[in-house]
Amino acid sequence: MEEYRSKKRFGQNFLQDSHFLHKIIQSIPDIPIQCIEIGVGLGDLTQELLKIESLIAYEVDLDLCSLLNKKFSNQIQSGRLNIIYKDILNLPSQQAWLHTHEYKVVSNLPYYIATHIILRLLRDRFCRAFLVMTQKEVAQKFCATTGQKEFCALSVLVESFGKAKMLFEVPKEAFSPMPKVTSSVFVIHKYSQQNQIEDSFLCDLESFLKIAFYAPRKTLFKNLSQVFDKKLLEEVFENENIKSNARAHEVKTKSFHHILQFLKKRNDNGKQTLTRTTKQRPS
């Protein structure tokens, strides 16, 4: 492959260590659906994926696309590989985002857009599972469980859609150019379609979690009482057996759902509003 200089604006750090490439391949969700790679890079992971999967690959760098089309010309001609030159963040997500049928994703995500992409994969009902590599600290947030200090709004959103599992770390020395941080690979398997949360509830949940985790060192009750009526909170906390001094990271995902449902129900009765009360919402 022709010599290529990485571009900082695309957050390009290419994984080229064969040991970790093989570990990723061995960890891919075993689901017989279309496999999609986000960010092809120099094609090292792509080459390994093509040994076991037909592949749709999205790449935002036109210079790389030209090089990759030459490198994988045989696989492209045979229909085993389809390289799409697109910025996926600019693709509409009202219906299908990356594919019109069920799919799974394998990707070494650029650090600066990793969270955004993962959240869109969670929302896309055609995406059934994904294995991604991100900065270690980001991976810890997505994979954290109740009681862990890393447990946050992102953790709750993941548990609302499926189950996350941390797999392994990848040292910065495995990349070229070498990043300043350690990376981690994790996988998320999403629940079946009938167990997916409704879009309208998801929108409210995201707003609600911003309030719940607004000040992590304060109690959940204190954070929520900046927006919601204290008597209603006392009632729902008692229903959920949540102590008044509990912090948000100590509360289970199901309880967040139940609290929100309770407040939404009262809102429907005209007694409470989710996004605005006589008190100002934290900014």
From Swiss-Prot:
Reactions catalysed according to its record: adenosine(1518)/adenosine(1519) in 16S rRNA + 4 S-adenosyl-L-methionine = N(6)-dimethyladenosine(1518)/N(6)-dimethyladenosine(1519) in 16S rRNA + 4 S-adenosyl-L-homocysteine + 4 H(+)
Intracellular or extracellular location(s): Cytoplasm
Gene3D superfamilies referenced in this protein's UniProt entry, alphabetically: Ribosomal RNA adenine dimethylase-like, domain 2 (1.10.8.100), Vaccinia Virus protein VP39 (3.40.50.150)
SMART domains from the UniProt entry: rADc
Binding site for S-adenosyl-L-methionine: 13, 15, 39, 59, 87, 108
The protein's Enzyme Commission number: 2.1.1.182
Any one Pfam family match given in the protein's UniProt record, by short name: RrnaAD
InterPro entries registered for this protein in UniProt: KsgA/Erm (IPR001737), rRNA_Ade_diMease-like_C (IPR023165), rRNA_Ade_Mease_Trfase_CS (IPR020596), rRNA_Ade_methylase_Trfase_N (IPR020598), rRNA_adenine_dimethylase (IPR011530), SAM-dependent_MTases_sf (IPR029063)
Keyword Cytoplasm: yes
Annotated GO MF terms: 16S rRNA (adenine(1518)-N(6)/adenine(1519)-N(6))-dimethyltransferase activity; RNA binding
Keywords: Cytoplasm, Methyltransferase, RNA-binding, rRNA processing, S-adenosyl-L-methionine, Transferase
One GO cellular component term noted in the UniProt record for this chain: cytosol
Broad class of where this protein is predominantly found: cytoplasm
HAMAP family: 16SrRNA_methyltr_A (MF_00607)
Function recorded in the entry: Specifically dimethylates two adjacent adenosines (A1518 and A1519) in the loop of a conserved hairpin near the 3'-end of 16S rRNA in the 30S particle. May play a critical role in biogenesis of 30S subunits.
Family, similarity comment: Belongs to the class I-like SAM-binding methyltransferase superfamily. rRNA adenine N(6)-methyltransferase family. RsmA subfamily.
Protein name: Ribosomal RNA small subunit methyltransferase A
Organism: Helicobacter hepaticus (strain ATCC 51449 / 3B1)
Gene: rsmA
